[in-house]
């Protein structure tokens, strides 16, 4: 086995999930992530955790949804056995790495929507654990990224096997700015959007549950906007439910999407926005800071962390960003959309420029704006 797989497992178990002896650990393993699953199982055992490994293959998932569509039954009641498993878990690790990235593309849209809504209690139970999502490099993901398997493996491990403590220190500077700020203004040639972040808490996403960070790799700072107004364009693509979204533009009033368009995937975008009442509102503003991610791969776990990008999510807001007692935006979806900030862009907080053309004031690449 590639030694980097064992290193990946060690970072996941020790730095990210912080597994202790006696922890009940559920590991969900995609069909292409078997090797990482083996390495993680060994690491959990070495640390005294109690393991339950669950196969998470796209093929059976697709067949199940197709069967439910044919049976004309609803998803009103959450699956009690899955709920019980998650309620008993201390840690939930999701190891992605499917062999077909579009496996559920032909599932009827209304079935996908109903399934998402029906999973609400299960999703809440999973989010109540120390959960972490990561990905094992597979041939299908390499192909989706337009890379050879060897190049994609290097890309994944460059993003995962980082000096997380040093990156956490750098990102803490941005967290401090957002925590004390009131209004974020995003400006590009096609975007003019203002977001209220008053009384919000930004998350320094260090790839560790100790910092309310649940992705490996990570490397972003994110918060939950209280309000948003303006127009935003997303020039970086992503795939949702097997459909590619490109050239997305949203017009937002009082944090409600009132108009939308897309060069590709507009029907799927509309379907997502209609999932439930919260799906047409913004739940997240995220700023990528992981320089180990140097290209778009059409895998959101990596793409949203890429340095010199900004992303906004329609749907669910994360509780870690909200004041005590505030429910925030609820939804069955959380779909991130990405914008490239490397050229002709400016990000300000309360009128102060905190990022220009992708660079922060503490970086050498940051330059003063030319005089008019």
Residue ranges and their predicted role:
Residues 1-229, 370:
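Active-site bordering "gate/hinge" segments
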Residues 41-46, 201, 248-251, 277, ...:
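Short, solvent-exposed amphipathic alpha-helical segments in soluble enzyme
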Residues 186, 251, 347:
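Short aromatic-centered micro-motifs
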Residues 298-370:
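Internal helix-turn-beta structural module
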């Amino acid at each position: 086995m590639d030694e980097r797989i064992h290193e990946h497992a060690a970072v996941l178990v020790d730095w990210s999930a912080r597994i202790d002896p006696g922890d009940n650990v559920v590991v969900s393993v995609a069909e292409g992530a078997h090797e990482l699953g083996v390495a993680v199982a060994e690491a959990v055992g070495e640390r005294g955790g109690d393991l339950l490994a669950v196969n998470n293959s796209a093929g059976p998932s697709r067949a199940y949804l197709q069967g439910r569509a044919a049976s004309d039954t609803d998803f009103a009641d959450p699956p009690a056995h899955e709920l019980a498993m998650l309620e008993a878990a201390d840690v939930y690790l999701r190891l992605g790495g499917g062999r077909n990235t579009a496996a559920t593309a032909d599932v009827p849209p209304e079935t996908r929507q109903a399934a998402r809504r029906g999973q609400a209690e299960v999703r809440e139970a999973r989010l109540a654990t120390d959960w972490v999502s990561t990905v094992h490099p597979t041939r299908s993901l390499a192909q989706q990224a337009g890379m050879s398997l060897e190049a994609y493996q290097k890309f994944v491990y460059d993003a995962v096997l980082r000096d997380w403590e040093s990156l956490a220190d750098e990102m803490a500077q941005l967290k401090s700015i957002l925590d004390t700020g009131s209004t974020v203004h995003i400006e590009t040639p096609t975007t003019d959007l203002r977001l209220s972040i008053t009384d919000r808490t930004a998350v320094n996403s260090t790839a560790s549950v100790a910092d309310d960070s649940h992705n490996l790799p990570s490397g972003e700072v994110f918060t939950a906007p209280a309000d948003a107004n303006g127009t935003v364009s997303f020039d970086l693509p992503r795939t949702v439910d097997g459909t590619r979204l490109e050239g997305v533009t949203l017009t937002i009033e009082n944090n409600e999407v009132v108009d939308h368009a897309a060069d590709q995937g507009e029907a799927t975008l509309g379907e997502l926005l209609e999932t439930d009442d919260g799906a047409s509102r913004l739940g997240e503003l995220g700023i990528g800071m992981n320089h180990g991610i140097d290209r778009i791969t059409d895998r959101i776990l990596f793409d949203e962390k890429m340095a010199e990008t900004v992303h906004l999510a329609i749907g669910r807001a994360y509780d870690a960003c909200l004041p005590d007692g505030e429910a925030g935006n609820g939804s069955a979806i959380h779909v991130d959309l990405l914008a490239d900030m490397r050229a002709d862009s400016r990000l300000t907080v309360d009128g102060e420029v905190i990022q220009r053309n992708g660079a922060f004031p503490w970086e050498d690449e940051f330059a003063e704006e030319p005089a008019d």
